[in-house]
Amino acid sequence: IYVPFWLFDADVAADGKYAATMVRTWSDAHYNYTETNHYSLLRSATMTYERVPVDGSSKLDDRLMQSLEPFDFKGAVDFQTAYLAGYLADRYDQSADISLEQANQRIRQSTENRLANTVQGYGNVRKEDGSIRLNNGEPIYVLYPVWLLNTSWQKKKYTFAMNGQTGKFVGDLPLDRTAYWTYFLSIFLVMTLLIYGLVWLFYWMM
């Protein structure tokens, strides 16, 4: 199936203020010492995000579609109906405005994580303040190829998906808990008996 996606660009300016500490301990013949240094750290960065995808179909699980990333935009071509011959194609039912907020949430979270990762080498770090400013470009509407498989097991439905470009396969596999615990307990019992036997063998050899 061809799944509708909105692609978003953004130029980002971000600032962060962090409180950090470093603790040093040492001892002499009489006392134990602890030295705590406190730091106020400022971080600023500009970042550019290109073609952040958000699926435009409310019928599809956003988490599942995000797990299929990345998609390759380099081979994109202008749309022609002939490309859909023999395939299913979904049409977006979530507008670019709605999808924009989802994209910006991902961009903000990624920016915050990347900024925080620049604070290294301290024992404890706490964020005190920060701001993220976004300037979005015009969205692009695309169709990406995705293979979908729906199945059910023990009255529960499962959906699997595969990226039609890269072959990346995602989904939650059903788990037979009875079989799992039977297998686990069997292995545990075998290992227990094996260890017990080795201990007795070692004891009699002594």
Question: Where on the chain are the PLM-derived regions?
Answer:
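Charged, low-complexity helical/coil segments in non-catalytic cytosolic or luminal regions
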Residues: 1-157, 178, 203-206
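Short, well-ordered alpha-helical packing segments
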Residues: 9, 189-190
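Alpha-helix boundary/capping detector
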Residues: 34, 175, 193-195
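Juxtamembrane amphipathic/hinge helix adjacent to a transmembrane helix
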Residues: 153-176
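Juxtamembrane/start-of-transmembrane alpha-helix segments at the extracytoplasmic/lumenal side
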Residues: 173-188
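Juxtamembrane boundary at the C-terminal end of a transmembrane helix
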Residues: 193-206
